[in-house]
């Protein structure tokens, strides 16, 4: 098994040690990376064991990086272009999988490239699309009604001053279209005070627009529904989230699958038989990045890792024998 070394030097995968510990790649295993990005998880999984890996990404640049890595992997890596919400259609035929991992949010490649339009620190075209299809952030900012903009910023960015920001955006675009990240960031900064934590006032609004442009929560909901069906018995599903909206969805979906939906009402009749859940939580609480990793990689500070295990089917008693 040749070690795979082709990973862009600027990419730092978050909570890599914890992801590998949860997945525990084994020889002959089959794994799925739903968010290839810079290939950090993919490389680590393939180097950890003589296994096979299917990887998904909607970004053509990520697919190009993955295809280059696949040459080194000698047939152990297969790339699929598309969204991880469509993992069943894209890679389901290659399963069932012994492990599936999702690293949500924007990759460092996308943030660092001003021309992708994700960053409010570097001026570039107001795009924010992880792929190449669909409306851009500029389309939303320049065409949505004020109430729609406010709703996007509030729901997806959790921005309390969403109405004020939406009003300022509509006033600014009446003078001239908003086409760059620098323009938008300036508009937001002019009407939102910097908070005590010294977080840039544009942070939440940019998050809200990015989530809306890429339908990130819809993709996650579809993935949370599909991934459990693709797991082999004993398989592990790992999700790394970066903000509370993602984490709440992952927490709720995994709790339901693991039968952790709370105690039934005392007024409801008790079920005749309690079925063993098909899944279990690998950790009772989400894991966070270590202090050392958070210092070295600020993006890791908000990361939370949750994991689900597909329980082996219970053995059925032999007919005629006592159970």
Swiss-Prot record:
GO terms for cellular component: cytoplasm. It is found in: Cytoplasm. Its EC number is 2.1.1.199. S-adenosyl-L-methionine binds at residues 39-41, 57, 84, 103, 110. Pfam families: Methyltransf_5. It catalyses: cytidine(1402) in 16S rRNA + S-adenosyl-L-methionine = N(4)-methylcytidine(1402) in 16S rRNA + S-adenosyl-L-homocysteine + H(+). This is Ribosomal RNA small subunit methyltransferase H. One of its GO terms (molecular function) is rRNA (cytosine-N4-)-methyltransferase activity. Its main location: cytoplasm. It is an enzyme of class 2 (transferase). Belongs to the methyltransferase superfamily. RsmH family. Gene3D superfamilies: Putative methyltransferase TM0872, insert domain (1.10.150.170), Vaccinia Virus protein VP39 (3.40.50.150). Keywords: Cytoplasm, Methyltransferase, rRNA processing, S-adenosyl-L-methionine, Transferase. The gene is rsmH. GO terms for biological process: rRNA base methylation. The lineage of its organism: Bacteria, Pseudomonadati, Pseudomonadota, Alphaproteobacteria, Acetobacterales. It comes from the Bacteria. The keyword Phosphoprotein does not apply. It comes from Gluconobacter oxydans (strain 621H) (Gluconobacter suboxydans).
């Amino acid at each position: 098994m040749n070690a795979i070394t082709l990973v862009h030097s600027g990419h730092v995968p978050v909570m890599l040690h914890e992801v590998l510990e949860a997945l525990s790649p084994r020889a002959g295993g089959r794994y799925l990376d739903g968010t290839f990005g810079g290939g950090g998880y993919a490389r680590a999984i393939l180097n950890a064991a003589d296994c096979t890996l299917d990887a998904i990404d909607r970004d053509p640049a990520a697919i190009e990086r993955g295809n280059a890595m696949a040459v080194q992997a000698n047939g152990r890596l297969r790339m699929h272009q598309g969204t991880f919400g469509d993992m069943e259609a894209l890679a389901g035929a290659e399963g069932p999988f012994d492990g599936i991992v999702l690293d949500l949010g924007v990759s460092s490649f996308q943030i660092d490239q001003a021309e992708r339009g994700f960053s409010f620190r570097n001026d570039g075209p107001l795009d924010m699309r992880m792929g190449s299809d669909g409306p851009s952030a500029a389309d939303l900012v320049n065409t949505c009604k004020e109430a729609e903009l406010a709703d996007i910023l509030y729901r997806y960015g959790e921005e309390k001053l969403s109405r004020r920001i939406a009003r300022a955006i509509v006033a600014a675009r009446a003078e001239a279209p908003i086409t760059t990240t620098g323009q938008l960031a300036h508009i937001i900064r002019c009407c939102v005070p910097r908070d005590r934590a010294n977080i840039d006032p544009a942070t939440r609004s940019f998050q809200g627009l990015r989530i809306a442009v890429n339908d990130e929560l819809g993709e996650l909901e579809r993935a949370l529904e599909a991934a459990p069906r693709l797991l082999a018995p004993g398989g592990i599903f790992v999700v790394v989230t970066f903000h509370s909206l993602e984490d709440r969805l992952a927490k709720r979906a995994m709790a339901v699958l693991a039968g952790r939906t709370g105690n039934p009402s005392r007024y409801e009749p008790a079920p005749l038989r309690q079925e063993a859940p098909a899944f279990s939580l690998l950790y009772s609480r989400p894991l966070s990045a270590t202090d050392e990793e958070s210092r070295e990689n600020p993006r890791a500070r908000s990361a939370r890792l949750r994991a689900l295990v597909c329980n082996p089917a219970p053995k059925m008693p032999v007919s005629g024998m006592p159970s």
